[in-house]
Every structure is written in structure tokens, then in C-alpha cells.
């Protein structure tokens, strides 16, 4: 059996303090119906909570005096965990989607790529438009700029340009974000 070195504290408790773990000598007590019972000694409040068959849970430790409520600890922790999971689930992380184009793109291909860009923007994602130059196409940088300006014009109602077109090696990049 492993023993804790002399003088070291026990493992810190996760979650709210309850019953004998409440360190404050006096607490403001709220019963199971939400009624304020006033400020009383922690021991007295714990006894009242046990009479009702509940625990005394510290819900606001930073208040003066701390606020404690008559609750079922297991149920309280479960509800808090459920609330945290729901908040994490509903939180939308904004992703950067990438669409690759060519300087000499045909109209139908362009329309297909534009539909995808619009779909990404409506979903709330940023879109990185990459225009790749091959071989001698590098000599015709203005063609790439025209395609980028066309994308910019076609998305101006639903998006704003976050990063204007710029060359990076053999490719031209632009980032558009939803408005």
C-alpha cells in the first residue's frame, strides 16, 4: 500500500465542496425549494440537510459568506457534467476549407467550385482559395489575379476578404470569411 509523504495534502477534490468538506464556519443556506434560510453555522446547516435526506453543497464559494444549497451531490455533479457536455457539443469550431483552382479554369468547373465555396461560407467556415500555376503559366500572373477577382466579386454579398490575393511560390492564395 502506497503512503503519502509526511506533510503532503490529500488529492484535491474535483467539483463543488459538500458536507464536511466545506471549510467556511458559516454559510448562507438555500433549501431544496430555493428558499433562503439565512446565514447559519455549517454544522447546523449540514444537520438540517441530513434531516431532509440531502447534502449541503457549496454552490458559490466566493460569496461572503459562501452560499450552500440542500442538494443531492451525485445528481448535482451529473447535471453539471451534462451541461458542460452540451455546451461543448453546441460550440462550433470554425474551420478553414481549401478550394484549389487553375488560372485557365473553364466556366462549368468554375461554377462547380463556386457552389462549393458558397456552401462552405454558409456553413460558417472560412475558405482558402488556392490558385496553382504550372510551368509557363507563371509568366501570366494577371490571369490568376483575374480569377481571384472574379471569386471575390461572386462572393462579396456573403463573404468578406480576410486575406487579399498574394503569391506564395507557384501559387496564389486568398482567404474569404463569412460576413
Curated annotation (Swiss-Prot):
Principal location: cytoplasm
GO terms (BP aspect): ribosome disassembly
Reported function: IF-3 binds to the 30S ribosomal subunit and shifts the equilibrium between 70S ribosomes and their 50S and 30S subunits in favor of the free subunits, thus enhancing the availability of 30S subunits on which protein synthesis initiation begins.
Family matches, as Pfam families: IF3_C, IF3_N
Cited InterPro entries: T_IF-3_C_sf, T_IF-3_N_sf, Translation_initiation_fac_3, Translation_initiation_fac_3_C, Translation_initiation_fac_3_N
Subunit structure of this chain's protein: Monomer.
Keywords for this protein: Cytoplasm, Initiation factor, Protein biosynthesis
Subcellular localization(s) per the UniProt record: Cytoplasm
Similarity section: Belongs to the IF-3 family.
GO terms under cellular component: cytosol; membrane
Superkingdom per UniProt: Bacteria
Protein name: Translation initiation factor IF-3
Organism name: Zymomonas mobilis subsp. mobilis (strain ATCC 31821 / ZM4 / CP4)
Molecular function in Gene Ontology: ribosome binding; translation initiation factor activity
